[in-house]
């Protein structure tokens, strides 16, 4: 059930990120609350793992502040939410996978379009990364 929730959340967030370049705050809040409730009901991961998962998103938000918004705060909020569900290690894998996929895409855009300053939504790469992690 959690996997379907995560996939559904990332699909909705990806669509929003592509269309509007922002992610609905209410979507992030609702998904986060559901994750916290499931954490206490299912007790599938340790509190330490939960906190490490949250920390990854917090670090992305800090990077957003340091880079003056070059990295979106919404991306960090998404990773905070996924951290509640996935824990530290898998959330880190999700982030690294998303970064690798977006880097590959950026290289292809650079090679074929030569538009270096194009803004690219990040959440769709997190969705693809999550699907790959679930397949492997």
Regions found by a protein language model. Give the residues of each.
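A membrane-topology feature that recognizes alpha-helical transmembrane segments
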Residues: 1-136
